[in-house]
Amino acid sequence: MYSPQVLDHFEHPRNSGDLADADARVRVENPACGDILELSARVEGGRILEVRFRAIGCVPAMACGSLITEMVKGKTVAEARAIRKDAIVQKIGGLPQASGHAAQLAVDALRALLEKTALNV
């Protein structure tokens, strides 16, 4: 049902938890299914140095939360802003049709985080 990448990120989440010295912290919820994704990041010189996530929800939501942190860590804010839902779906090895919302939740949380980071710089 789920790709090996989804299961790996779910069973062995990367960058899980909260970043105590974060420059920005956001919480985004999908009202249709109740999934919640929180991101916190430390940005210096326009580059994302550290990022953490916490997720409450389905397996794909947790996996996409883990993956998005790997995708943006070390990237510039501009590079992170360019990440789209289809890139997440491809990198995670595909998602069932009914689980596409998980990749969108990750993108929405990332956009909110980057916006908040820009306001705090």
Residue ranges of predicted features:
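Alpha-helical support elements that line or immediately flank enzyme active sites
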Residues: 60, 64-75
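A short interface-forming secondary-structure element
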Residues: 42, 46-47, 51-61
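Short beta-strand elements
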Residues: 30, 35-45
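Short, thiol/selenol-centered motifs that function as redox-active sites or metal-ligating centers
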Residues: 33, 55-64, 102
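C-terminal binding/interaction regions
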Residues: 1-20, 25-27, 49, 75-79, ...
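A generic alpha-helix surface/boundary motif
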Residues: 35, 62-66, 82-86
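Short connector loops at helix/strand junctions that flank enzyme active sites
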Residues: 21, 34-36, 48, 63
